[in-house]
Each structure stands twice: as structure tokens, then as C-alpha cells.
UniProtKB/Swiss-Prot annotation:
Keywords: Cell cycle, Cell division, Mitosis, Nucleus, Ubl conjugation pathway
Protein task: Component of the anaphase promoting complex/cyclosome (APC/C), a cell cycle-regulated E3 ubiquitin ligase that controls progression through mitosis and the G1 phase of the cell cycle. The APC/C complex acts by mediating ubiquitination and subsequent degradation of target proteins: it mainly mediates the formation of 'Lys-11'-linked polyubiquitin chains and, to a lower extent, the formation of 'Lys-48'- and 'Lys-63'-linked polyubiquitin chains. The APC/C complex catalyzes assembly of branched 'Lys-11'-/'Lys-48'-linked branched ubiquitin chains on target proteins.
Residue span of region Disordered: 33-53
GO cellular component, one term: anaphase-promoting complex
Gene that this sequence comes from: ANAPC13
Record's subcellular location: Nucleus
A biological-process GO annotation: protein K11-linked ubiquitination
Source species: Homo sapiens
PANTHER family: ANAPHASE-PROMOTING COMPLEX SUBUNIT 13
Subunit structure and binding partners: The mammalian APC/C is composed at least of 14 distinct subunits ANAPC1, ANAPC2, CDC27/APC3, ANAPC4, ANAPC5, CDC16/APC6, ANAPC7, CDC23/APC8, ANAPC10, ANAPC11, CDC26/APC12, ANAPC13, ANAPC15 and ANAPC16 that assemble into a complex of at least 19 chains with a combined molecular mass of around 1.2 MDa; APC/C interacts with FZR1 and FBXO5.
UniProt record similarity statement: Belongs to the APC13 family.
Protein name in the entry: Anaphase-promoting complex subunit 13
Pathway(s) annotated for this protein in UniProt: Protein modification; protein ubiquitination
InterPro entries linked to this entry: Apc13
Amino acid sequence: MDSEVQRDGRILDLIDDAWREDKLPYEDVAIPLNELPEPEQDNGGTTESVKEQEMKWTDLALQYLHENVPPIGN
């Protein structure tokens, strides 16, 4: 039947008891500040890092909007 899951036996070779019991260390990991999400979640609750937010502006080329403003008047 199409609605039943077909298990792939090859994955069983990758996962063993030692792998299941392996734990990550509880030590601190140094993360650059521009990779961290914004600390104030009052601004919309974004989970994007500062770097990701800056890239969004360059993806849309919005940083050039203020340079291409037509002159006011004649």
C-alpha cells in the first residue's frame, strides 16, 4: 500500500547503541555576535541573526533606495 512506510534497512547500519548514547559536551561554544538572534524579542519575535537580517536588505537592494531619490521640484 502507498500509505504504509517502507523502512530502509541501510539506515540501521548507521545507528547503533553507541551512537544513541553519545552526548554532546556541556561546554560553552563561542558564537560570533552577528550570528546570534536579536536579544530583544519585543521587536516582532524574529529568530534571524543580525547577519541574516542584513543579508535580507542586500537581497532586496533596499540599501540603494535613498541614493536613487528623484529631485523634488522642477
